[in-house]
Regions:
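Short helix-to-coil transition segments within interhelical loops
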Residues: 273-282, 361, 400, 667-675, ...
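N-terminal Sec/SRP start-transfer signal
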Residues: 1-2, 263, 280-281, 289, ...
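Juxtamembrane segments of multi-pass membrane proteins
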Residues: 26, 32-38, 391-517, 521-525, ...
Length: 761
């Protein structure tokens, strides 16, 4: 049931996400190529449209500003985008959830992204105050919308969605031109191609054309921020839907094998009688085939319904992150068919394997008790080690080694249970590790202030004078394009000092990394994915100012878990750019008591593009990831419970049924039920204990594989599993074992001693 439900839920979630993506992208014409630049005349779109292979072009303004929301002390960052025209040639069209599209008039009307509206409970006709390019303006919400460009609404400067402090707004072109001070000008274009295979050639032409306008680099849809997260989740669902259910299906095959083997063993006399009366092997086998078929239905049908429930729950969780026009759980006929086949496979593997016993049984042989198993000397006897074992210990290890196949299967099954718990808990471990290192060890500031343009050192002195500000550090962020062999990528480069105390760089061993006076430091992504090594040279093209191009030596790597980036010594960067000392990002360490007062004063500073309070960012990060982890962990732990109970309980039942006559005989001879219990319990406990180490190793392997499924551009997570997680998984199995042993003691107490006095023949 567990394997079927996981397979159905994962495959259906994959199908549902893919279907929602494809229909939304196609119906609302998601662009193939994107480009941002400093400023260009609106007429640039005519030149772009005349390029071979270009089907549609949309020129627009894309600019960030501050938003004042009633009831929220902190300002939010708004990304203001030109409203797409209502025509067939528009790209990245809006899907209206509520209201209407904005119209030109005395008031500035806007459409707001559903994520921001939902977070603040905004309604149609609500008013907000925004500041764009230092100009304050009241805007009225007339519609709540979504777009294929912002399915995953993420601030490019933040690692995770924070819908309380970041929102998308669409404004009519003329009004946005006025607010952005860009009359008849644009700073962003999107294109749709006749054939996406032409993307590389078209991008080269776009870069050449836009170079004089301060081009920051054109890029394909696959590098678009929202699309990266969408594709990453779809890919994870597809892969996880393959290897996780396989674990449960193998366990199911083992359980079916145990049940059928036990039935055939207990019913040997009846099988012999039927065969003696003339029933053929196939007729007797058909009885067990029917049992297998019923077991398949009992496991598969509820599994499909449980898969539908889990898939629906998963879709509801996705709706808080991914904003599609229609994201509904789609249980396809193919998923149902796959579920039925998946339920059939373990039954066939586990059941038919035992049916050969029926064909091998002759009536005369089956009417007698089974021939005692032939014990052969083990390595303990060969090395004469048995003298160090008590009689009871010899009985235990001989019983364990009598059926090595069953022992190995049981260990693998319990190992799967332990591994599933480790997978479920490890994501919380990795989340805690990232928070501890990214937000506490590396980022030691309380507030981060970004400016629209680089400012002189005087801005740091001005911020330091604010009451409650304890420490100020400035950085220079520059957009660059890095090139190495056939690779190229647009990333931010930060110029900083080595003595910075509020933003530290660390390596994978959590040691602080210093920036040499020459060269560039890169995030670990470029080592893993591009194969860049220390000492290699890369080409850095600066995407602002004079658009200089330099070749720099890679002097090392840092382990930043979120996003891509590069780092240089600030003085070296100033020399390369030919600038005086300037900063466009300033981090503040503040007195927590004065944080509210400082934030209020920061609102009055001109040219601020965003103010990020670390504790709010951390809270949003924990809520965003924590929600997904809770759903995932709950499902996995439930399935682990089913596996543990199924394997341990069935194993005990089989062992008990095989040795019930011997246990009854011992009790007739005067053994107390505790003494009989102590003969059986250690054997079961040893089998469980033998699964601990393989289970932990399997858990680590599965965590490693699941981490590798995450796109390295979104989260470059290390494989972190705390000791407490291993202990928790083992404790979980021990609790199941304890309840199972209590049950076996109860069964021993209820043994009918008269059965031991009967002649077995």
């Amino acid at each position: 049931m567990c394997g079927v439900s996981l397979l159905v839920s994962s495959s259906s979630a994959y199908t549902s996400l893919k279907k929602a993506r494809d229909s939304f992208y196609e119906d609302y014409q998601f662009a193939d190529i994107f480009a941002e630049f400093k400023k260009a005349p609106f007429s640039i779109h005519h030149k772009l449209k005349s390029m071979p292979g270009v089907k549609l072009v949309q020129a627009r303004i894309l600019i960030d500003g501050l938003i004042y929301v009633r009831g929220q002390e902190e300002t939010a960052v708004g990304r203001f985008v030109t409203l797409p025209e209502e025509s067939k040639e528009s790209l990245n069209k809006l899907y209206l959830r509520q209201g209407r599209f904005p119209e030109l008039g005395e008031e500035v009307e806007v459409n707001v992204h559903e994520a921001f509206a939902r977070a603040h409970k905004l309604k149609i006709h609500d008013e907000l105050t925004v500041i764009i390019q230092g100009r304050s303006q009241k805007v009225r919400i007339v519609g709540i919308a979504i777009s294929p460009e912002f399915v995953y609404a993420l601030n490019p400067s933040a690692p995770m969605p924070d819908n309380l402090h970041f929102g998308i707004f669409w404004v009519p072109r003329k009004q946005l031109e006025y607010l952005a001070k860009m009359k008849d000008e644009v700073n962003s274009i999107t294109l749709q191609l006749d054939h996406t295979l032409q993307a590389g050639a078209v991008i080269k032409k776009i870069d050449v054309l836009l170079k004089v306008y301060g081009n920051r680099g054109a890029y394909e849809r696959k590098h678009q921020l929202s699309n990266i997260f969408v594709e990453d989740e779809i890919r994870q669902q597809k892969t996880m839907g393959m290897f996780l259910p396989s674990i449960f299906l193998l366990v199911a095959a083992f359980l079916v094998n145990i049940v059928i083997a036990r039935l055939i063993s207990l019913q040997r006399p009846q099988i012999a009688t039927l065969k003696a009366l003339g029933y053929t092997d196939y007729e007797v086998s058909s009885h067990y085939l029917k049992i297998i078929f019923v077991m398949m239905l009992v496991g598969t049908i509820p599994g499909i319904f449980l898969g539908w429930t889990i898939g629906s729950l998963l879709m509801n969780t996705y709706k808080t992150f991914f904003f599609f026009s229609d994201l509904t759980f789609y249980l396809s006929p193919l998923a149902i068919l796959i579920g039925l086949l998946a339920g059939m496979i373990p039954c066939v593997l586990g059941g038919l394997f035992n049916l050969k016993t029926i064909f091998q049984l002759t009536p005369a042989e089956a009417m007698r008790p089974p021939i005692p198993a032939q014990f052969q000397p083990t390595f303990i006897e060969r090395f004469e080690l048995e003298k160090y074992f008590a009689i009871r210990s010899r009985m235990i290890y001989r019983n364990l080694l009598l059926r090595p196949g069953r022992l190995v299967a049981l260990i693998l099954g319990l190992s799967s249970s332990i591994a599933v718990i480790i997978i479920a808990a490890s994501w919380q471990d990795m989340l805690d590790f990232v928070i501890s290192n990214q937000f506490n060890r590396q980022q030691r500031h309380d507030v981060s202030v970004s400016f629209q343009n680089p400012l002189s050192e005087s801005v740091m002195r001005e911020l330091l004078r604010l009451n409650g500000v304890l420490l100020v550090e400035g950085y220079r962020n520059v957009p660059i394009r890095i090139r190495y062999k056939q690779y190229k990528r647009e990333i931010p480069l930060m110029g900083r000092k080595n003595l910075n105390r509020l933003l530290k760089l660390i390596d994978k061993k959590l040691n602080q990394v210093t920036i040499p006076e020459t060269g560039v430091l890169l995030t670990r992504f470029f080592d893993k994915q591009w194969g860049i090594k220390t000492g290699d040279r890369v080409v850095i093209e600066f995407l602002e100012g004079e658009f200089k191009e330099v070749e720099l030596k890679v002097v090392g790597f840092i382990d930043d878990f979120m996003g891509l980036g590069a780092y240089m010594n600030d003085i070296t960067l100033q020399n390369v750019l030919g600038e005086e000392p300037s900063y466009n990002v300033v981090n503040l360490k503040v007195d927590p008591v004065k944080l509210s007062e400082i934030y209020t004063k920061l609102k009055t500073f001109p040219l601020i593009s965003s103010v990020i309070i670390k504790k709010e960012l951390l809270r949003g990060f924990q809520e965003t990831i924590g929600c997904m982890i809770k759903v995932f962990s709950s499902v996995m732990i439930f399935f682990a419970l089913v596996i543990s109970v199924g394997i341990i309980y069935n194993s005990i039942r089989v062992t008990f049924s095989e040795r019930a006559w011997e246990m009854s005989s011992l009790m007739v001879l005067g053994f107390h039920r505790w003494s009989v219990f102590n003969l059986l319990a250690p054997e079961v406990m040893i089998q469980v204990f033998l699964a601990f180490i393989p289970g932990c190793l399997l858990g680590w392997l599965l965590v490693f594989l699941s981490v590798k499924l995450v796109h390295p551009e979104t989260l470059d997570l290390p494989v972190i599993i705390y000791r407490s997680t291993f202990a928790l998984s083992i404790l979980f199995v021990l609790v199941v074992l304890a309840f199972s042993l209590m049950n076996i003691f109860r069964m021993i107490s209820r043994l009918k001693l008269a059965d031991a006095l009967k002649i077995r023949e």
